[in-house]
């Protein structure tokens, strides 16, 4: 018996509609198009054309699979992604439109809107790529990308098609998925620019370094199973969907291991699940990363986050006085990430906030935090031995109300909101005695203006020095600034509240240098 295209589509659409498939008409057309190898437009203008028995039987077999909630992409074996058709089967996750945001962020000048706490970025890979010649001119000059969990390879291959001078290493734990990815690489003629590795995350990468690490990792919690579509739950690979630890396990693995595989100034671009922005950003903040941008999908949900490691090497000052001990290195590796400063950690912060610039070995810094447990203390110090000592003292005394920025002051100033600090301590900074060096002083005219803007009205700034000329030059500088009032004009020898005599203070006394203190109050004015 023969039926027309119109009759076949109508009956199939009714059956699909009865099981809750909202796009029943479209899916019926897709299945029939696949059977007769004609475009959908052909079906729409030839509704009265008769189908033969072979065509109808083939169509009915495919329809029966769809009626059992098998995804249509698996039935026809292809799925469109980023304007290309990729081979898919039950061994790989079906590419989603939301994941195109991941590629978009990497490749294009994105029109996607970053969140208010983001710096608008675009064309991450394009910027890297444009700074280097094509790979054909020099084999070592190309953008090197790592994709973790490649699945069908749709992300990696899309990037290669969009970026001619990119090279990709793509990993997956599934050998079946790797076979699919290799077939897609063959289809789009990029086999010479992609290396597909059987690996559980970073395990088999050796010592390779990458400009960008990109991933759409498994991020669904098993608790979400009751809310999932049958097509996804019963047919797509479990390992590509679900992650332990409330869906966050993969992000923890990436955050803990990615730095050693990134080149200097490298980036991480990750897709996240619905409502996971806060949890994922906290994981990366705790492991020493900056959150550079958060991008939304077409539904307005946060979908892609751009991370970069906090750079501990961008500093003008000495970083290590003597070799770090095993304990010190362990503290820097394992404890410092928990306390690393980032601007995101100040969002919705209700406590009083104090900043100490150049805390040395940290005796004063830790004592202030201990004496004021309801406040937050931010410490800036380039001397890693001192940073490690703060972490040691904090651990011994169970002090947690602090953040550390082990870098040059200038790199943190833009991340401190104006009118946010209740107090600033600048105790015994390098005096830079020579005239040509004075511009390097922490306490100079330009920085004083910036610090003034960071202080709340009536906030305090404490400056101390054991170098007499530097101290009185600082007073002259302050007297030129009408936004500060000196609170201790009659006694510069008396320190501020909760001050502890540090080792440096003791050395100054022994060397017959007198420590002096200026206690300033910020007077109400424009910020």
Curated annotation (Swiss-Prot):
Keywords: Methyltransferase, S-adenosyl-L-methionine, Transferase, tRNA processing. InterPro entries: DNA_methylase_N6_adenine_CS, HemK-like, N5-glutamine_MTase, PrmC_N, RF_methyltr_PrmC, SAM-dependent_MTases_sf, Small_mtfrase_dom, tRNA_(Gua-N-7)_MeTrfase_Trmb. S-adenosyl-L-methionine binds at residues 149-153, 172, 201, 216, 356, 381, 408, 430. Residues 1-311 are annotated as: RF MTase. Transmembrane segments: none annotated. It comes from the Bacteria. The active site is at 430. HAMAP family: RF_methyltr_PrmC, tRNA_methyltr_TrmB. In the C-terminal section; belongs to the class I-like SAM-binding methyltransferase superfamily. TrmB family. Methylates the class 1 translation termination release factors RF1/PrfA and RF2/PrfB on the glutamine residue of the universally conserved GGQ motif. This is Bifunctional methyltransferase. It comes from Rickettsia felis (strain ATCC VR-1525 / URRWXCal2). The lineage of its organism: Bacteria, Pseudomonadati, Pseudomonadota, Alphaproteobacteria, Rickettsiales. The gene is prmC/trmB.
């Amino acid at each position: 018996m023969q039926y027309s295209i119109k009759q076949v589509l109508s009956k199939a659409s009714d059956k699909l509609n009865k099981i809750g498939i909202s796009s029943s008409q479209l899916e019926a057309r897709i299945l029939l198009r696949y059977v007769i190898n004609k475009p959908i437009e052909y079906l729409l203008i030839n509704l009265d054309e008769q189908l033969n028995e072979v065509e109808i039987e083939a169509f009915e077999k495919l329809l029966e699979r769809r009626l059992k909630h098998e995804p249509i992409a698996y039935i026809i074996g292809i799925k469109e992604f980023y304007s290309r058709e990729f081979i898919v089967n039950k061994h790989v996750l079906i590419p989603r439109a939301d994941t195109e945001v991941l590629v978009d962020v990497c490749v294009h000048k994105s029109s996607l809107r970053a969140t208010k706490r983001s710096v608008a970025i675009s064309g991450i890979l394009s910027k890297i790529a444009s700074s280097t010649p094509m790979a054909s001119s020099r084999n070592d000059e190309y953008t090197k990308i790592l994709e973790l969990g490649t699945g069908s390879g749709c992300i990696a291959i899309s990037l290669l098609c969009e970026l001619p001078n990119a090279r990709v290493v793509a990993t997956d734990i599934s050998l079946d998925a790797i076979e699919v990815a290799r077939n897609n690489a063959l289809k789009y003629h990029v086999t010479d620019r992609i290396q597909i590795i059987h690996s559980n995350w970073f395990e088999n990468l050796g010592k390779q370094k990458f400009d960008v690490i990109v991933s759409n990792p498994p991020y669904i919690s098993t608790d979400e199973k009751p809310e999932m579509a049958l097509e996804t739950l019963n047919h797509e690979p479990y390992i590509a969907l679900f992650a332990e630890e409330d869906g966050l396990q993969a992000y923890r693995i990436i955050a803990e291991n990615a730095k050693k595989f990134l080149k200097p100034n490298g980036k991480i671009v990750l897709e996240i699940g619905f409502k996971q922005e806060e949890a994922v950003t906290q994981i990366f903040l705790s492991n020493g990363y900056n959150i550079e941008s958060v991008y939304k999908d077409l539904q307005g949900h946060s979908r892609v986050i751009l991370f970069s490691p906090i750079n501990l090497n961008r500093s003008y000052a000495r970083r290590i006085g003597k070799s770090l001990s095993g304990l010190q290195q362990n503290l820097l590796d394992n404890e410092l990430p928990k306390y690393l400063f980032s601007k995101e950690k100040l969002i919705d912060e209700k406590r009083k906030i104090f900043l100490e610039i150049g805390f040395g070995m940290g005796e004063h810094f830790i004592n202030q935090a201990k004496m004021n447990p309801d406040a937050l203390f931010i410490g800036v110090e380039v001397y890693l031995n001192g940073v490690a000592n703060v972490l040691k003292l904090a651990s011994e005394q169970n002090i947690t109300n602090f953040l550390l920025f082990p870098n040059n002051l200038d790199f943190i100033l833009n991340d401190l909101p104006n009118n946010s600090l209740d107090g600033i301590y600048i105790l015994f900074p390098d005096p830079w005695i020579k005239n040509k060096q004075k511009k390097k002083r922490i306490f100079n005219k330009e920085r004083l203006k910036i610090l003034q803007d960071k202080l709340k009205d009536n906030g305090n700034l404490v400056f101390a020095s054991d170098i007499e000329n530097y101290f009185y030059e600082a007073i002259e500088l302050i007297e030129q600034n009408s936004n500060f009032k000196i609170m201790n004009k009659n006694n510069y020898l008396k320190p501020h509240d909760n001050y502890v005599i540090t080792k440096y203070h003791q050395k100054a006394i022994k060397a017959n240098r007198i420590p002096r203190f200026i206690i300033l109050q910020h007077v109400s004015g424009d910020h």
